[in-house]
Amino acid sequence: MARIATESRTTGETKIQVTLNLDGSGKAQVDTGVGFLDHMLDQIARHGGMDLEIEACGDQHIDDHHTVEDVGITMGQAFRQAIGDRRGITRFGHAYVPLDEALSRVVVDLSNRPSLSWRVKFPTQKVGNFDTELFKEWFAAFAQQGGITMHVESLYGENSHHIAESCFKALARALRSACAVDATLGGVAPSTKGTLSD
């Protein structure tokens, strides 16, 4: 069964469409109008083994906040739809990913009990023109809408770009592990209560 979903979101602030294939080959076609976010989402696709298409436009004459958050919301909704009832998946995943001097760790549980634990500090307020406080907004929106318990931690690092990118790459690798089908489960939900869809 194909694990593919398309979700759209239109508000007075943004218009977004996301197509996500969890069993892809790492191809990304992303245009959010926010260059650094595009770069990070390309990492999700590449290192998560997903195919990702995103087309977004927003009120960037104000700032990038609405676009970044709403892309996280819509991508999370597409993830939730694509993963389905979560039967037979590994469920848990974690990854440590370095980028030069920076090292980050992400741990996920596809429990359908969304939450974000965020322990990431950036030494600068911006990466280029991108506000570093918006990284948490994207992760929070994606976790909430995707039904993911997510722990994101920067263990150390000096360069804000490297810290952010190592977090996104670690998320990609953790999701790749958690989404993998575990043949030993025989299609059963990996939970003692028998379901992860409620």
Swiss-Prot record:
Single GO BP term: L-histidine biosynthetic process
Enzyme Commission number, as recorded: 4.2.1.19
Molecular functions (GO terms): imidazoleglycerol-phosphate dehydratase activity
The keyword Cytoplasm is assigned to this record: yes
One Gene Ontology term, aspect cellular component: cytoplasm
Pfam families, A to Z: IGPD
Superkingdom as given in the UniProt entry: Bacteria
PROSITE patterns assigned to the protein according to its UniProt record, in alphabetical order: IGP_DEHYDRATASE_1 (PS00954), IGP_DEHYDRATASE_2 (PS00955)
Keywords: Amino-acid biosynthesis, Cytoplasm, Histidine biosynthesis, Lyase
Coiled coil location: none
Bilayer-spanning residue ranges: none
Reactions catalysed according to its record: D-erythro-1-(imidazol-4-yl)glycerol 3-phosphate = 3-(imidazol-4-yl)-2-oxopropyl phosphate + H2O
Class of enzymatic activity (EC top level): lyase
Pathway it works in: Amino-acid biosynthesis; L-histidine biosynthesis; L-histidine from 5-phospho-alpha-D-ribose 1-diphosphate: step 6/9
Keyword presence, Glycosyltransferase: no
Locations listed in the record: Cytoplasm
UniProt similarity note: Belongs to the imidazoleglycerol-phosphate dehydratase family.
Name of the protein: Imidazoleglycerol-phosphate dehydratase
Source organism of the structure: Magnetococcus marinus (strain ATCC BAA-1437 / JCM 17883 / MC-1)
Phylogenetic lineage: Bacteria, Pseudomonadati, Pseudomonadota, Alphaproteobacteria, Magnetococcales
Gene name of this polypeptide: hisB
